[in-house]
Amino acid sequence: VITLLWQVMNEAINPLQTRGKLVILTGKGNNGKGTFQDMLKNLVGGGNFSTLRPDQFKGFELGSLVGKTLNIGDDIENNFLPEVSNLKSITSGDSITINEKYGRVYELELKLLCMFSANEIPKTKDRTNGWYRRLCIIPFDADFNGKKENKAIKQVYLKDKQLLEWV
């Protein structure tokens, strides 16, 4: 799993070489998913990530992905997803239609990593091999419940320039 997490970090900061994977971090709460996502946000920088959830990959909301290298949907619900075609296209590096609110409509190939965290993997109508081969499901099995929270991890360490450069 550690090697896979390093590969995900590489994909987040080098999105032009897409591996065609949609990353889903799974596991019960308080296990490090959010901390890992915060580290990635700090690695790519403030203006380079978006925060859409899978059910928002449609309509005007797609415009918020333009120019980003990473999308992180944190703590997504286990709701049924009737439509995942835009997610599949973005993951593969294929063109999608961007419809700017009060603006133009155009086709664009987005180069970004889509990552979501969830307690359970969301269900979808799509049961094709094309959907399943794009999924990269990473289990987070740690359990930090009952342990004293080290607030410095998120407030200091994950923002430390030297640490981020090392990563």
Where in this protein do the model-derived segments appear?
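Conserved catalytic/switch belt of AAA+ P-loop NTPases
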Residues: 13-14, 41-45, 84-106
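AAA+/SF3 P-loop NTPase mechanochemical coupling elements
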Residues: 60-67, 99-117
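Conserved AAA+/SF3 P-loop NTPase catalytic/coupling segment centered on the Walker-B
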Residues: 69-92, 106-110, 124-131
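Segments of Walker-type
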Residues: 1-3, 47-51, 65-66, 109, ...
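Phosphate-sensing "switch" segment of ASCE/P-loop ATPases
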Residues: 108-111, 127-167
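Alpha-helical scaffold elements adjacent to nucleotide-binding pockets in ATP/GTP-utilizing enzyme cores
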Residues: 36-39, 68, 82-90, 97, ...
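Conserved nucleotide-binding/hydrolysis micro-motifs of P-loop NTPases
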Residues: 77-78, 119-123, 141-146
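P-loop NTPase catalytic core of nucleic-acid-dependent motor ATPases
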Residues: 1-69, 136-138
